[in-house]
Amino acid sequence: MSISIDEQYDKVYRYCLLRVRHKETAEDITQETFLRYLEHPHYNSVDKTLQLLYTIAGNLCNDEFRKTKTAELPEDKADGGDIEDSVLSGFELKQALAKLSDEDREIIMLRYINEVPLNVIAKLHNMSRFALNRRINNILGRLHEYLGKEELI
């Protein structure tokens, strides 16, 4: 196994929290993600552990959305808030991010909050790194417009 579970738990939790916007639900999904990962028949031989964890977590988040049909408002700020605070108030950023599609918001959160490598995000979204870079630039451009800022991240 290329990475330890402890190293990735916080990243997967933040990802789940950003997706479902409810602390307890994110904790449950994160735990279920790691249980399913460990139950995977060949988890010791998986080269792309992070990608598998995010895929499992994403599927569980989608299942949760299907159950509830609506996402709850966040109870408190996600753990990756240092970036938000250094650029602008968390409230302004949350408003701007809310204007993005779910997939665009997920891409930005994975890249800039969870610091997931581009190649992993590209594989999760079935696109090339080139297409992902172009899409991120497009998303950041829209965020700049929404915020009226010259620099964002």
Language-model features: where?
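A short pre-motif secondary-structure segment
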Residues: 107-111
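DNA-recognition helix of helix-turn-helix
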Residues: 119, 123-151
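A short, charge-rich alpha-helical start-of-domain segment used by transcription regulators
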Residues: 1-14, 18, 27
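Arg/Lys-rich amphipathic alpha helix in sigma70-family domain 2
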Residues: 55-75
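Structural recognition of an alpha-helix C-terminal capping motif at a helix-to-coil junction
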Residues: 14, 28-35, 39, 47-59
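C-terminal flanking helix
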Residues: 13, 34, 101, 105, ...
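Acidic, proline/glycine-rich intrinsically disordered inter-domain spacer in sigma factors
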Residues: 67, 73-98
